[in-house]
């Protein structure tokens, strides 16, 4: 018995035109190729909300590792700003969030910073800073001060020179900023037991007495001259010459002591 006799012709699908042959002559033949079933795995796509994921991570536990896909702001931390002056639809009412009347409801730049309604503002009620706190030149230091105690503890030997450079080398002073251009001044705190040669821009009165008593040689370095106009310098020279002559005449007119 053949395979064609097992399948009735009536069970064959009806073929529509344009087939022009005899349908009864068609014979169904078994397929020699095995049927292959291919299973395709569907990719699942999930949409994650950042804010919700951050909230879930916080509530799930502390052992959850933070990643780029679960980072987000905390719920309620980011609020939408008020849209003032954009009509009733912005949710601020008919006055659009500016109130009824007044200077703050008008157009323009508004009031100045620090304005308190006409009374004396706080930044004018407080006293002004004077001296070095206010940055005035009169309150700034004019010298790098060094006491006799610092020179004694620096380890200088007899006959050595004490100056701004040697004090820097021994790390007694470490001026910075504008202090690097200032001259040296010796103050009288402490005692000095060695005979030294001290070069400084100024000496205090008591320090000068102590150093002369200890046998030290003092050298006053010339200060930095301030620039003045030539006409002003000429007038200053004339005034100095005039007062020098006047002082000389007064000393000559004084009677000699008996």
Swiss-Prot record:
Q: Which PANTHER family match?
A: 50S RIBOSOMAL PROTEIN L15, LARGE RIBOSOMAL SUBUNIT PROTEIN UL15M
Single GO biological process annotation from the record: translation
Among the GO molecular function terms of this UniProt record, one is: mRNA binding
Q: Which HAMAP family match?
A: Ribosomal_uL15 (MF_01341)
Give the keywords, sorted.
Chloroplast, Plastid, Ribonucleoprotein, Ribosomal protein, Transit peptide
Q: Which family does it belong to?
A: Belongs to the universal ribosomal protein uL15 family.
UniProt-recorded name of the protein? Large ribosomal subunit protein uL15c
- Assembly with partners or alone: Part of the 50S ribosomal subunit.
């Amino acid at each position: 018995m053949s395979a064609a006799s097992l399948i009735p012709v009536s069970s064959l699908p009806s073929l529509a035109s344009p087939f022009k042959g005899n349908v009864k002559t068609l014979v169904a033949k078994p397929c020699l190729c095995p049927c292959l079933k291919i299973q395709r795995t569907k990719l699942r796509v999930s949409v994650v909300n950042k804010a919700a994921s951050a909230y879930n991570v916080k509530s799930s536990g502390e052992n959850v590792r933070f990643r780029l896909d679960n980072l987000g702001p905390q719920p309620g931390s980011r609020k939408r700003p008020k849209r003032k002056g954009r009509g009733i639809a912005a949710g601020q009412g008919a006055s659009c969030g500016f109130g009824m009347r007044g200077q703050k409801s008008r157009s323009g730049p508004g009031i100045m910073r620090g304005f308190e309604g006409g009374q004396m503002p706080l930044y004018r009620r407080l006293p002004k800073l004077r001296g070095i706190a206010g940055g005035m030149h009169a309150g700034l230091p004019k010298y790098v001060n060094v006491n006799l105690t610092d020179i004694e503890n620096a380890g200088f030997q007899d006959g050595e020179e004490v100056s701004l450079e040697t004090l820097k080398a021994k790390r007694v002073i470490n001026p910075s900023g504008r202090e690097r251009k200032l001259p040296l001044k010796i103050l009288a705190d402490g005692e000095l037991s060695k005979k030294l040669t001290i070069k400084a821009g100024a000496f205090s009165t008591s320090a000068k007495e102590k150093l002369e008593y200890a046998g030290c040689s003092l050298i006053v370095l010339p200060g930095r001259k301030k620039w003045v106009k030539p006409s002003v310098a000429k007038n200053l020279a004339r005034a100095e010459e005039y007062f020098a002559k006047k002082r000389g005449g007064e000393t000559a007119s004084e009677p000699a002591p008996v």
